[in-house]
Curated annotation (Swiss-Prot):
Residues 82-177 form the Toprim domain. CDD domains: TOPRIM_recR. NCBIfam families: recR. The keyword Ion transport does not apply. Keywords: DNA damage, DNA recombination, DNA repair, Metal-binding, Zinc, Zinc-finger. This is Recombination protein RecR. InterPro entries: DNA_Rcmb_RecR, Rcmb_RecR, Rcmb_RecR_Znf, TOPRIM_dom, TOPRIM_RecR.
Amino acid sequence: MALAYDGAIQRLIDAFANLPGIGPKGAQRIAFYLLNAPDEESQALIDAITEVKEKVRFCDICGNVCETSPCPVCADPRRDHSVICVVEEPKDVMSIERTREYRGMYHVLGGVINPMANVQPSDLNIAKLIERLKDSEVKEVILALNPNVEGEATTSFLSQLLSQTDIKVTRLASGLPVGGDLEYADEITLGRALAGRRAV
């Protein structure tokens, strides 16, 4: 049986281990780092987490994270409101913004279709997307989902759904590795994928 630490330190390790991308050893390193860190540093982390939980919300229009709704992208009159880029998560918005190649709007689904995890189309932010498309200003929807099985299934579902409209539906060009995540794509590759998007 593996040795566990007593009480509070083990609870902290377990809490960090529950975060994505952090395994048991990484969680232990972070916990002990905080144990030995100056009180101000630990308090700054506590304050940052508390502030995020209290202030950050999802944009009523696109579903991106923001402190005030609508988010800065939706509220910006200089953006191209005729194009909506559909992404899985808010972090994908930031990845695309870093390319400086895209000046349109976004729509965050909040996930992808995944029957294995019991995530159905009705669990995603699709109804709000359909509502937005009733605005005659929208001329193109870019499906910018991760090139993995779930992303492809969601892209296929959305392209069939949107084929009933007069809106041009495109997807990112190749260059992104199959099974990869937009979050990890470099700016040049992602920028080229946006520029070379193709009809679906």
